[in-house]
Each structure stands twice: as structure tokens, then as C-alpha cells.
């Protein structure tokens, strides 16, 4: 649906902070997105988190979900960061971690649009590995002009 080249048009992030590798579903009617991040042992964060037992930091799982939600927001508006708008992560509610994400996992990212009030967007997000939830949260983003 969206390869990394198109994703780079919709997210301002770059290595090592671009955490969406591919979008597999984008449903405008359901206002939802499904994407994934392939988690490799070569990720720079594994050098320190934790060398003897590497796990993906929870804050980066949240960031990956927020990036998927950001793509959805841009697509819903038919806009891109190059148009002068960005989404800033401003909060999360109902955050839960259920199991660690390890090197070799494919982290599936799902986001569903919940609401928009003025420039504040809310998304229901979850991350899965092998079909099992590893993280879920309601993510709040602020839309800002550059």
C-alpha cells in the first residue's frame, strides 16, 4: 500500500527515528491504518537497552504507533509535512504494555481515528507481535503549522 519512499513523504522522521517500514492497509471509511516495523538486532537502541537481553524501549513502541497515526492524519487531510504542517505527540491515555518486543519481531502498528477538536487529534492505537497485543494506548497529537 505504501512503501518506505512514500512513507518518507508523509513523515518528517529519518534514520534512526523513522519507525514505520511499510503501510499495509489504509481504510478511509473506517479511518484506520495498519503498518509495520521490522525490529532488527541492528537497531541502535539495542546497544544499550539491554546488551545482554535486548528489548525495544517502550517509548519507541509508543512513538512507532504515533508515527502510524500521523500518517493516517496526513492522509485524512490529503496533506504532507512539506505543506507546512506537523503532528506533535502531546499525550497518551490508557497506556498498557503487555509483553516485550525483541530483535527479529515484526511490530504491527494499528491506529484508528477517534476525534479531532480544533487542532488536537486523538487516535486509538495498538501494537502487535505475532497477532498478540504488546502495547495499546489512546494517543493525542497536536497539529501545528511550521
Curated annotation (Swiss-Prot):
The protein's Enzyme Commission number: 4.2.1.59
Family matches, as InterPro entries: FabA_FabZ (IPR013114), FabZ (IPR010084), HotDog_dom_sf (IPR029069)
Active site feature: 49
Keyword hit for Cytoplasm: yes
One Pfam family of this chain: FabA
GO molecular function, one term: (3R)-hydroxyacyl-[acyl-carrier-protein] dehydratase activity
Annotated protein name in UniProt: 3-hydroxyacyl-[acyl-carrier-protein] dehydratase FabZ
Species of provenance: Pseudomonas entomophila (strain L48)
Taxon lineage: Bacteria, Pseudomonadati, Pseudomonadota, Gammaproteobacteria, Pseudomonadales
Amino acid at each position: 500500500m505504501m512503501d518506505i519512499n512514500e512513507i518518507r513523504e508523509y513523515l518528517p522522521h529519518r534514520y534512526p527515528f523513522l519507525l514505520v517500514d511499510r503501510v499495509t492497509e489504509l481504510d478511509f471509511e473506517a479511518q484506520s491504518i495498519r503498518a509495520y516495523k521490522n525490529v532488527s538486532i541492528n537497531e541502535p537502541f539495542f546497544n544499550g537497552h539491554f546488551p545482554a537481553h535486548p528489548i525495544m524501549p517502550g517509548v519507541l513502541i509508543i512513538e512507532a504507533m504515533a508515527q502510524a497515526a500521523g500518517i493516517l492524519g496526513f492522509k485524512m487531510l490529503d496533506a504532507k509535512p512539506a505543506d507546512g504542517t506537523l503532528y506533535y505527540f502531546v499525550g497518551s491515555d490508557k497506556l498498557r504494555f503487555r509483553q516485550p518486543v525483541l530483535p527479529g519481531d515484526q511490530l504491527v502498528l494499528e491506529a484508528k481515528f477517534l476525534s479531532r477538536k480544533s487542532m488536537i487529534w486523538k487516535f486509538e492505537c495498538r501494537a502487535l507481535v505475532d497477532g498478540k497485543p504488546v502495547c495499546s494506548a489512546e494517543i493525542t497529537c497536536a497539529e501545528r503549522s511550521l
